[in-house]
């Protein structure tokens, strides 16, 4: 599977330091990456409705991290998956009476176009679940060989209950885990399971569902093992960052880590980084609720993609916030002011601004702080003929906002 075209990133004088981000597992700021390189896996879309602003906020946030690493002189290895076969996709296919493969291809193409419009740097490994079935089946076989799976009515389950430190990412109590597992695609109440938190690895063949051959019977993979297998295939362990939205902390990231670590005996990730959820009309923006605002719809209605990106960046990646049309209006005005300022023949000196913007981004990706600094620069007078060009380059290279 291919990603989208990479935007051209301007070069800047000097370098930033390595960024520090909030690690959900340790509940503190940690330095991520090193001068020897950085690796990141970000959970991708299930392509049946893409790309809403909740998606966009997540991928723009991790794009900010990629750009900050690049600015620190770090070589980045970045993988992202596409869950191109899954229960919600199959349900959508039944609802609209279309092949699930066609829906997945169409929505993935739309996602690629949206990411390109938002100037998101693509992952160097953009990988679908279907194309990764050999690796997923191989990982399940490793877990089977270690006695960490069991069969139930043709399905294969991971013995989560056998992992002593399970829950090290979320730190949730057992009752909260079971409740969230039920709410987020799990089956804690299924009769015959050895433990409510045991996770489905392989769903045996069902009528009118796609299936593939495996040593343990035809079927299709469960959610968590997909990401574990793709990450293990394309990135070295431990990952520097496992990323995604806050709704993936549990069960997805706890279970992905448990399965990967059980198979390899190695730590899965040094840091787990999560973005806050975006609301609309008083509720979390989600496909199940249907309260979605799509990037493509905003752009089709005349919004500049750079204004959409600015609106997203004006909220710290870890905060929860609510989308309103006013935010796009404000971002459109800000974009116009920035563009006017960098087209002036002279401006206030930009060297100090560059250092300050870099400092904000290295400190837990403080994009709102960086934006405020550029706002302040646009109001200042100066006679530096190189400043407007430098500020335009830093906005593009560091924030991804092309002026």
UniProtKB/Swiss-Prot annotation:
Binding site residues for L-cysteinyl-5'-AMP: 43-46, 58, 81-83, 223, 245-247, 278
The record's GO molecular-function terms, alphabetically, read: ATP binding; cysteine-glucosaminylinositol ligase activity; cysteine-tRNA ligase activity; zinc ion binding
- Known cofactor(s): Zn(2+)
GO CC, sorted alphabetically, is: cytosol
What positions carry the motif 'KMSKS' region?
Answer: 284-288
* E.C. code: 6.3.1.13
Residues annotated to bind Zn(2+): 43, 227, 252
Q: Name one Pfam family in it.
A: tRNA-synt_1e
Binding note for cofactor: Binds 1 zinc ion per subunit.
Main role?
Catalyzes the ATP-dependent condensation of GlcN-Ins and L-cysteine to form L-Cys-GlcN-Ins.
Tell me which PANTHER family the record gives: CYSTEINE--TRNA LIGASE, CYTOPLASMIC, CYSTEINYL-TRNA SYNTHETASE
Name the protein family: Belongs to the class-I aminoacyl-tRNA synthetase family. MshC subfamily.
> How is the subunit organization of this protein annotated in UniProt?
Monomer.
Know the name of this protein? Answer: L-cysteine:1D-myo-inositol 2-amino-2-deoxy-alpha-D-glucopyranoside ligase
């Amino acid at each position: 599977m291919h990603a989208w075209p990479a935007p051209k990133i301007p070069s800047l004088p000097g370098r930033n330091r390595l960024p520090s981000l909030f690690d959900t597992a340790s509940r503190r700021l940690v330095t991520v990456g090193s001068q020897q390189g950085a690796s990141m896996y970000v959970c991708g879309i299930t392509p049946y409705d893409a790309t809403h602003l909740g998606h966009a906020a997540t991928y723009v946030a991790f794009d900010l991290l990629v750009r900050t690493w690049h600015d620190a002189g770090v070589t980045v290895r970045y993988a992202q998956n596409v869950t191109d076969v899954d229960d919600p996709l199959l349900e959508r296919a039944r609802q609209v009476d279309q092949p699930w493969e066609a829906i997945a291809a169409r929505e993935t193409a739309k996602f690629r176009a949206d990411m390109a419009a938002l100037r998101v740097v693509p992952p160097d490994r953009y990988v679908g679940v279907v194309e990764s079935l050999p690796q997923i089946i191989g990982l399940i076989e490793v877990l089977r060989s270690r006695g960490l799976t069991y069969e139930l009515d043709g399905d294969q389950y991971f013995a989560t209950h056998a992992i002593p430190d399970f829950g090290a990412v979320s730190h949730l109590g057992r009752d909260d885990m079971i409740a969230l597992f039920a709410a987020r695609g799990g089956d804690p109440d299924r009769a015959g399971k050895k433990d409510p938190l045991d996770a489905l690895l392989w769903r045996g063949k069902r009528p009118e569902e796609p299936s593939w051959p495996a040593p343990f019977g035809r079927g299709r993979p469960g959610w968590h093992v997909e990401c574990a297998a793709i990450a293990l295939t394309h990135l070295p362990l431990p990952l520097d960052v496992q990323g995604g939205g806050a709704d993936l902390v549990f069960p997805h990231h706890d279970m992905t880590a448990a399965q990967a670590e059980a198979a390899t005996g190695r730590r899965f990730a040094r840091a787990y980084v999560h973005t806050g959820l975006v609301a609309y009309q008083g509720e979390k923006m989600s496909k199940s609720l249907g309260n979605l605002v799509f990037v493509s719809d905003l752009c089709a209605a005349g919004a500049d993609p750079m204004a959409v990106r600015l609106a997203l960046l004006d909220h710290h990646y870890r905060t929860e916030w609510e989308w309103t049309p006013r935010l796009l209006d404000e971002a459109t005005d800000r974009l116009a002011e920035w563009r006017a300022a960098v087209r002036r023949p002279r401006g206030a000196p930009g060297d100090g601004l560059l250092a300050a913007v870099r400092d904000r981004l290295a400190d837990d990706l403080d994009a709102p702080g960086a934006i405020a600094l550029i706002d302040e620069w646009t109001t200042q007078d100066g006679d530096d003929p190189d400043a407007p060009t430098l500020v335009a380059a830093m906005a593009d290279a560091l924030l991804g906002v092309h002026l």
